[in-house]
């Protein structure tokens, strides 16, 4: 994701980021890039995605507080809030939006598609089903990212090894999330 982001950041140009944003979790930099990070929930793996994204930028010389302003917002598992966050990033004319998890990625793409603001997503299990990528995996616009597709075959093998006498297994999923629905279809009935 960091390599893709670097390419997108190069296209963003270097903007003055005298940000008047009063968001308490936004840091500031004198000259550099403005990035909005939208995260769907507080969760260890999603937190790791955010931290890894920022670490990747830092390794490339783009560092929060030096030449990078970050406006981090958490949707608290609410898709309406994810949309509001994405709209606010577009209104603020962020240089790039990093969207963590499928609902945030879909909201960011929908909000930014006509605004010439690149979107980088992560923690999206099925970018094609989420309409963030074409069937062949190519970009659908100014959006790119990484997938965290689940290894269904390996999971089933592990379940069989741990519970060889199991006749049925239950799978919990969220019907309102595209990634969840597409993943559950991977399991044999």
Describe the residue ranges of each PLM region.
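Bacterial N-terminal signal peptides
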Residues: 1-7
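Bacterial lipoprotein signal-peptidase II cleavage site
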Residues: 8-30
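Extracytoplasmic "Venus flytrap"
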Residues: 34-60, 71-80, 176-180
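An alpha-beta-alpha
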Residues: 35, 53, 144-189
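Stable alpha-helical elements in mature extracytoplasmic
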Residues: 45, 49-56, 81-85, 93, ...
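Short beta-strand elements in bilobed, periplasmic/extracellular small-molecule ligand-binding domains
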Residues: 61-82, 142-143, 188-189
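Beta-alpha junction/loop-to-helix N-cap segments that form part of ligand/metal-binding clefts
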Residues: 71, 75-134
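Rossmann-fold dehydrogenase core element
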Residues: 136-146
